[in-house]
Amino acid sequence: MVLYIILAIIVIILIAVGVLFYLRSNKRQIIEKAIERKNEIETLPFDQNLAQLSKLNLKGETKTKYDAMKKDNVESTNKYLAPVEEKIHNAEALLDKFSFNASQSEIDDANELMDSYEQSYQQQLEDVNEIIALYKDNDELYDKCKVDYREMKRDVLANRHQFGEAASLLETEIEKFEPRLEQYEVLKADGNYVQAHNHIAALNEQMKQLRSYMEEIPELIRETQKELPGQFQDLKYGCRDLKVEGYDLDHVKVDSTLQSLKTELSFVEPLISRLELEEANDKLANINDKLDDMYDLIEHEVKAKNDVEETKDIITDNLFKAKDMNYTLQTEIEYVRENYYINESDAQSVRQFENEIQSLISVYDDILKEMSKSAVRYSEVQDNLQYLEDHVTVINDKQEKLQNHLIQLREDEAEAEDNLLRVQSKKEEVYRRLLASNLTSVPERFIIMKNEIDHEVRDVNEQFSERPIHVKQLKDKVSKIVIQMNTFEDEANDVLVNAVYAEKLIQYGNRYRKDYSNVDKSLNEAERLFKNNRYKRAIEIAEQALESVEPGVTKHIEEEVIKQ
């Protein structure tokens, strides 16, 4: 037994030792990777990067940047790369002692140092590339500026007439570029690449602005010397022609406004000659806006004349229509009010319409007189005609509505009389059916309903004979009588159908009287109820009796009665 225990302990120890050596082998691989990485980063070409700068002009800012980067290289090597060897050595020693965690910590520190060293190299590489790119950009901008300088100088010399009085100032501004180009050469020779870049970039922007001025100035001069004076002339003679055609354009103030615009235009060329183009554009925009306002006023007058010519005849027709309809309404009201009740407000409205129409006709006559003058402001005439058109349209709509109301009075009276005749005819027909039916007697409630309808009909007939008739009240009463008549007819039909159905049930049930005493008893009760005009209750008892001996028969009998 003891032997087995000893063997087990030995096995466990051997397994533990094997695991430790396995773990140490894995950690050893991590250390070897760190060593490989160290060997790789030691070959990073710091000096080669700096060598690219040495090809440039190592003076001024370039020399300062070169020295700073060289110093950073030394510091990076001492601070990040030098301690790596010691960290790796410590990790190996700790690993031999099976201190896995401590060994891993040393390797992690070594990797962090190498990360920092690589970042330092990457930063140096970016800085070097940036400096080289800036040198290249500076030279490209410089070459472009030299070309622009020559072209601008040649353009002013060759096309001096296009720039007017601004040509001299343009030449002066262009000549200022030459010493600034030379200044760039000095900055570049001194190695001040950042100052050189800022200088040449600013010079390029100024050249682009002056180039845009050179493109804009001929357009401004052409607008100032030709286009606007031509528009002034066209506007002046165009307005003169319109006045001959009868237009009143005094409110446009053509002569005074044009004189003011000419004065304002005279200040534009001096602004152009001083290269104050923003102010020149503002003045030209203001002149064009005022011209547009004048054109809008004139165009409005021309359109107003066309509109006046189109609407004048329409308004004339509408005024005559309103006057004729008003006369017709006055005549109709005098006739209609003898036979029908009419609100006094309707009669007053007609008289008010007459006054308004006469007032509108007077205004229209004044407008026609105004249009017969040698000079007419058609925009005002258009507004006045629109006022007339709106008002006469409202009057015509109201008069037409009133006329339809008068016509409706006669139609409503005829409709009420027709409905009353139909009620009388239908009432007699229904009552005859009640008398001719199988009812033992006409139920008292139908006699009462008939008498009520007769009374209402006599009352309405008396109102028909009175004058003037209040048509609305009369129509409402006839509508109520029609409702009474419909109720009378519906209930009568219901009673007649129930009576026939009850009679059919009793007749059919007679065949079961001898064999079924309970059926005989129920049918006797149904007959008693039938004689007392209680048809619904008689139906209930008869149906119950028949269903007890012949289920479903009552439905068949009911369908036959409905078909009849």
Curated annotation (Swiss-Prot):
The chain crosses the membrane at residues 5-23. Keywords: Cell cycle, Cell division, Cell membrane, Coiled coil, Membrane, Septation, Transmembrane, Transmembrane helix. It is found in: Cell membrane. It holds the Pfam family EzrA. Its main location: membrane. It is a single-pass membrane protein. GO terms for cellular component: plasma membrane; septin ring. One of its GO terms (biological process) is septin ring assembly. Signal peptide: none annotated. Residues 1-4 are extracellular. It comes from the Bacteria. Residues 24-564 are cytoplasmic. Negative regulator of FtsZ ring formation; modulates the frequency and position of FtsZ ring formation. Inhibits FtsZ ring formation at polar sites. Interacts either with FtsZ or with one of its binding partners to promote depolymerization. Belongs to the EzrA family. This is Septation ring formation regulator EzrA. It comes from Staphylococcus aureus (strain JH9).
